């Protein structure tokens, strides 16, 4: 499993740490990457540019060679023959062309076994100008076939939101975004909470919508409706409450994603994305047919600056495979170009040794867990093309790191972001997993959405929608964030980068509390200590002061020269790596911890150092173990020898709390003593969201506001 570390730009920059000359400290300062981590070369990170300004969706393609390619020669011959053949033979030409492409594909594979797919990809990934010609040909073919779908309904959210918005109302809402937004709250079934935020235009709005129970309640294209009736006949609860906002083009952050409902949510947003791009394409095709009939003076506004309309941000390549599989269920194309190569480079089998890992871990890291990728998908009426150039793609799927390296080089020079100028639907799936990579990449991508393009890229500005030309595209873009839990970082992204003037929806859960489900056979003493903190900026210093003056002193005071200590078997769980470094340095240099032996392991520790530290801790040679949240996220170790848990801060993921507290029950012989010493966790008022998931929604309020004391104990 490739662990996401600084070598790929996920964490803090790799620096040489000062080595502590003491036998009590492990050699952890080298900060080597975890086992299996691959260092991405500069060439692999910066291959995004193609020719003049085309952006490639492949992260290992070579420069395209337009000369001496048999396939290009074939294309020239076909184009020459097409010039001499009339429109009546259009379909026959296309069939002939497909036949020759198939023959060329087979010939390429035979000529170059093992590299056939890569060589073919070089031929198929044509440049932007060539794609334009191909797209025009496909549009003509679509026109000849005619539209198979019914007329657009006036109640269709796509028509109301994008195609025919009320210009006066739209201007009024955009103007109101600079002022205070109104908020309304309601309670939903299954313990969910609903919050709606919308621009204050002088009148109160009720954004609560009735639940949708099946695709029959949606305005889908006929082709998608038929597939949805087979693969997604019903929306499961609580997805019925999510559906009206997802398909209604509201911005939404959904904090109830689980391993149980993730697949259904994925099917829903893939169906929505496909419906959007097909309606966009069909509208262009219909208007193309109007121009010859009604004259060139007719004003048609049906396009953006560039073709890509949907951006899906995902944590791993295997997550990308799952999304593509979902798309393929609903869009059953006759031909899928480069699908074989996609599966070979994006999908791998699960690790059979992970049977004891938790379900959420297997979902995230199962298969290919590489977080450096990007992929363009191009849709025509009968074909889906993988690894299409971004400017020819309809949907872009990427990891935050993969997409950022397509925008910006390592030296900070921006090379390309025009392909993001016309994104109308952006989906962030498994956002809580992205927090453990590098959240700065996500914010960087959002800051480059819907900007005015630097170049024309063949755009027909006479057909660009007015709200694109006015620089208002971000106010109509739909942003969907799906996460297992909501954090301040996710809230900040939604507040500062989701601008939908039709409304923003937040749906999150109420929590019974992870303290009720600790996997230890006897009751565990769980103590929460609150400390005062004036601001988030000052919180790290206040936490450190409280820890060293109160918690650590109680651990060290019973230490005796005989070598026995009540602090033995103490695991200190530290959420932040910066805090980890600070605590490690204090343990190594402070007189308060002179007689405390300790080990320290983090996401940057080598496998050898991790194994040695765990062994010393289990055998009692180390009294204290420092352990980071990010290391636990990537490895899910089961640490033996734990008799007491001290949490420097409560974890974001409530599953982590249960797993860390569960270390107390690993040794059956010592479980009674360990349960009595139990867990002690520090928190401040800035930890409200985390504390709610750990202690429970009802308990959190009193723990934050209680004036009679700052210590709360549960068993």
UniProtKB/Swiss-Prot annotation:
The keyword Ribonucleoprotein applies. GO terms for molecular function: rRNA binding; U3 snoRNA binding. GO terms for biological process: maturation of SSU-rRNA from tricistronic rRNA transcript (SSU-rRNA, 5.8S rRNA, LSU-rRNA). Pfam families: Utp25_C (PF06862), UTP25_NTPase-like (PF22916). Residues 131-153 have a biased composition (Acidic residues). DEAD-box RNA helicase-like protein required for pre-18S rRNA processing, specifically at sites A0, A1, and A2. This is U3 small nucleolar RNA-associated protein 25. It comes from Uncinocarpus reesii (strain UAMH 1704).
């Amino acid at each position: 499993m490739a662990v996401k570390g600084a070598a790929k730009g996920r964490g803090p920059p790799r620096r040489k740490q000062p080595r502590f000359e003491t036998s009590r400290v492990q050699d952890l300062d080298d900060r080597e990457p975890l086992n299996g981590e691959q260092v991405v070369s500069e060439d692999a990170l910066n291959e995004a540019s193609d020719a003049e300004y085309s952006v490639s969706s492949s992260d290992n393609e070579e420069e395209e060679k337009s000369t001496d390619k048999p396939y290009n020669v074939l294309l020239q011959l076909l184009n020459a023959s097409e010039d001499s053949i009339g429109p009546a033979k259009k379909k026959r030409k296309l069939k002939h062309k497909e036949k020759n492409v198939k023959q060329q594909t087979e010939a390429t594979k035979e000529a170059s076994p093992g590299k056939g797919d890569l060589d073919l990809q070089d031929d198929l990934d044509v440049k932007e100008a060539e794609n334009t010609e191909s797209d025009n040909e496909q549009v003509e073919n679509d026109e000849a076939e005619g539209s198979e779908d019914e007329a657009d309904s006036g109640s269709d959210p796509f028509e109301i939101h994008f195609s025919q918005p009320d210009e006066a109302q739209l201007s009024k809402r955009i103007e109101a975004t600079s002022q205070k937004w109104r908020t309304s709250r309601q309670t939903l079934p299954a313990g969910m909470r609903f919050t709606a935020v919308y621009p204050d235009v002088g009148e109160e709005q009720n954004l609560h919508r009735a639940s949708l129970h099946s695709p029959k309640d949606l305005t889908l294209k006929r082709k998608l409706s038929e597939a949805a009736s087979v693969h997604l006949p019903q929306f499961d609860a609580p997805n019925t409450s999510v559906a009206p906002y997802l398909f209604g083009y509201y911005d939404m952050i959904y904090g109830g994603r689980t391993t149980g409902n993730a697949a259904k949510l994925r099917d829903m947003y893939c169906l929505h994305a496909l419906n959007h791009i097909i309606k966009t394409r069909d509208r262009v095709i219909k208007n193309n047919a109007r121009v010859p009939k009604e004259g060139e003076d007719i004003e048609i506004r049906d396009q953006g600056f560039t073709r890509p309309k949907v951006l899906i941000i995902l944590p791993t390549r295997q997550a990308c495979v799952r999304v593509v599989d979902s798309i393929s269920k609903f869009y059953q194309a006759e031909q899928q170009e480069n699908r074989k190569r996609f599966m070979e480079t994006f999908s791998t089998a699960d690790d059979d040794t992970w049977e004891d890992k938790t379900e959420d871990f297997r979902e995230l890291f199962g298969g290919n867990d590489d977080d450096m990728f990007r992929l363009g998908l191009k849709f025509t009426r009968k074909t889906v093309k993988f690894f299409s150039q971004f400017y020819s793609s309809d949907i872009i799927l990427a990891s935050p790191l993969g997409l950022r390296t397509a925008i910006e080089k390592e030296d900070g020079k921006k090379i390309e972001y025009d392909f993001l100028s016309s994104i109308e639907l952006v989906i962030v799936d498994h956002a809580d997993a992205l927090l453990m990579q590098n959240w700065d990449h996500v914010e960087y991508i959002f800051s480059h959405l819907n900007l005015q393009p630097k170049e024309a890229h063949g755009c027909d500005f006479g057909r660009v929608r007015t709200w694109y030309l006015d620089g208002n595209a971000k106010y109509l873009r739909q942003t969907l964030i799906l996460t297992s839990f909501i954090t301040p970082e996710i809230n900040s992204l939604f507040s500062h980068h989701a601008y939908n003037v039709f409304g923003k929806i937040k749906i999150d859960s109420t929590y019974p509390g992870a303290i009720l489900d600790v996997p230890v056979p006897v009751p565990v003493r769980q103590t929460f200590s609150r400390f005062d903190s004036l601001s988030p900026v000052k919180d790290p210093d206040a936490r450190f002061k409280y820890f060293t003056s109160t918690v650590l002193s109680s651990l060290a005071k019973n230490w005796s020269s005989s070598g026995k200590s009540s602090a033995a078997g103490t695991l200190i769980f530290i959420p932040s790596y910066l805090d980890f470094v600070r605590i490690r340095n204090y343990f190594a240099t402070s007189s308060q911890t002179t007689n405390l032996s300790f080990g320290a392991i983090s996401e940057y520790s080598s496998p050898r150092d991790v194994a040695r530290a765990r062994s010393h801790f289990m055998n009692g040679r180390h009294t204290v173990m420092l352990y980071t949240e990010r290391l636990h996220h990537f490895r899910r170790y089961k640490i033996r020898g734990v008799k007491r848990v001290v949490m420097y801060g409560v974890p974001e993921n409530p599953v982590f709390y249960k797993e860390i507290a569960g270390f107390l029950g690993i040794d059956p012989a010592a479980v009674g003593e360990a349960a009595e010493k139990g867990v002690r966790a520090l928190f401040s008022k800035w930890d409200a969201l985390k504390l709610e998931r750990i202690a429970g929604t009802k308990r959190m309020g009193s723990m934050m506001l209680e004036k009679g004391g700052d210590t709360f104990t549960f068993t």
